[in-house]
């Protein structure tokens, strides 16, 4: 007498563990802000002045605006936003030591990797600002990141990004080649292209001001020299048939979700 085949017992499989997105940068990852003085606490004053001069006037006036700061580092930009009355702010950074420093200053920051954090947060924010340069991503990674930002923003939401300016003939090439984790430069035209490819509209490109420390006399010297040089360079570009408006060391843009 033959025995009946035994029924197979199906055990439910465990849900797959999400894999962290491995980015191309090896030493200075995009989702962790590395640029800080040796005395990290001293940076709060200087970076507050820098961010106020470059970003504050481009943000929505409503202080309940939901703002995400990606690659927040020790919390410089988050600190400025909180100081200016924005109370619905969150910073994320992939380096727990930097986040720990921000939290010692009672800043709302947490450890997270940017790509994974943005996935599944559709329509969660009004403004997203990466504190790290876009060029710590490859071009494909940049567009992927910006599309994640677009999905995480509400309709009419805003992203503010920046990168190294390849149009500056003095520092453009050096900026690109001195760091193996710098993958490209942009100009005002190519930065606009990147944002358009990522689905953003109402793109406004602007220079990032370096000389914003008015108590330092050298600030005025630097501002005067760079102003004259940039004026002369615009004339040279015209002779080559190029209309270049932004020649600052770093170039930024604000863009909106349609």
What are these regions (language model features)?
Residues 135-137:
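A short His-aromatic
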Residues 161-182:
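Short, glycine-/aromatic-enriched active-site segment of Class I SAM-dependent methyltransferases
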Residues 153-159:
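Short glycine-dipeptide loop
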Residues 107-110, 177-180, 221-223:
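Short, hinge-like loop/turn segments at secondary-structure boundaries
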Residues 183-198:
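Short alpha-helix
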Residues 1-123, 127-131, 140-147, 248-251, ...:
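Conserved N-terminal segment of class I S-adenosyl-L-methionine
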Residues 193, 204-258:
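A C-terminal cap/extension of S-adenosyl-L-methionine-dependent methyltransferases
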């Amino acid at each position: 007498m033959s025995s009946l085949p035994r029924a197979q017992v199906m055990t439910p499989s465990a849900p797959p563990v999400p894999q962290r997105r491995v980015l191309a940068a090896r030493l200075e990852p995009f989702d962790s802000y590395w640029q800080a003085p040796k005395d990290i606490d001293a940076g709060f004053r200087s970076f507050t002045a820098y961010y106020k001069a470059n970003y504050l006037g481009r943000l929505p006036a409503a202080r309940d605006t939901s703002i995400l700061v990606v690659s927040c580092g020790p919390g410089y930009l988050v600190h400025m936003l909180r100081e200016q009355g924005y109370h619905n702010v969150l910073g994320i950074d992939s380096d727990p030591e930097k986040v720990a420093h921000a939290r010692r200053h009672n800043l709302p920051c947490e450890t997270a990797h940017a790509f994974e954090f943005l996935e599944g947060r559709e329509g969660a924010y009004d403004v997203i600002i990466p504190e790290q340069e876009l060029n710590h991503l490859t071009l494909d990674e940049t567009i992927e990141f910006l599309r994640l930002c677009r999905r995480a923003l509400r309709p009419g939401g805003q992203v503010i990004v920046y990168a190294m300016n390849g149009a500056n003939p003095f520092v453009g090439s050096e900026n690109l080649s001195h760091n193996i984790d710098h993958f490209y430069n942009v100009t005002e035209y190519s930065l606009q292209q990147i944002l358009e490819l990522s689905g953003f509209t109402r793109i406004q490109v602007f220079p990032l001001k370096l000389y914003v420390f008015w108590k330092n006399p050298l600030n005025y010297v630097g501002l005067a020299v760079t102003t004259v040089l940039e004026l002369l360079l615009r004339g040279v570009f015209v002779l080559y048939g190029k209309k270049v408006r932004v020649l600052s060391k770093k170039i930024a843009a604000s863009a909106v979700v349609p």
